[in-house]
Structure formats: structure tokens, C-alpha cells
Design a protein with these regions (language model features):
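Short N-proximal segments of mature Sec-exported proteins
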Residues: 2-51
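Compact alpha-helical subdomains of small soluble proteins
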Residues: 30-104
Length: 104
């Protein structure tokens, strides 16, 4: 994973985590939260598969979470992250869908 892709993946992880912990009063579809959590898991798994040390990955995600936590749901950014993930990770869309099915 290139440094540019890693930075984007961290940003997307932060956006996805913010989606999961939306402030009260925000409207959203529950399936969006499921897809966001599954996407975080798939991005981390892929990062580890490509040789990024887990501590390095987690540090980057934590910084991104701090950046986006408490923000309102941004459908455009979320969709851009889905497109990024699906382009970056082979079978990314299928991997996310598979994880969604195992969340419960």
C-alpha cells in the first residue's frame, strides 16, 4: 500500500468510525453503520496483509478518528471512501459484504 493510499485509508477509517458514533439527533440508515464498521475491518485486514505493522496502522486510525469523531454524517465523503476501498482492495466490495453478514 502506497503512503498516499495509506493516508486515504486512515482518513476513511476515521470517517467510517465517526459514522458509527454519530451524535444523537443525526438521521441515518442503519445499514450505513454496518457497512462503515465492516469497511474499517476490511481496511485493517488489508493493511496487515500488505505488511503494515498493526501498531503503525492503529496509530494512523486513532489520529483519523480524533479528526472526524463527533462530525455529522457526510454521505459524499462516505461514498468516496466506499469507491476508494473498492478500487484499492481486490474484491473489496465482496469482502465488506461478507463482514457485514458476520456482524451479528
Amino acid at each position: 500500500m502506497s503512503d498516499t493510499d495509506k493516508t486515504k485509508a486512515w482518513d476513511c477509517s476515521g470517517i467510517y468510525m465517526a459514522n458509527y458514533f454519530l451524535p444523537s439527533g443525526e438521521t441515518f440508515e442503519y445499514s450505513m453503520k454496518e457497512k462503515s464498521m465492516a469497511s474499517v475491518k476490511v481496511l485493517k485486514a488489508y493493511a496487515l496483509e500488505t505488511g503494515i505493522p498493526e501498531t503503525n496502522w492503529d496509530e494512523g486510525v486513532n489520529k483519523a478518528v480524533d479528526k472526524y469523531y463527533g462530525s455529522k454524517y457526510d454521505k459524499v465523503k462516505t461514498e468516496q471512501c466506499h469507491t476508494f476501498l473498492e478500487g484499492l482492495i481486490p474484491n473489496g466490495k465482496e469482502r465488506v459484504n461478507k463482514v457485514v453478514q458476520t456482524l451479528y
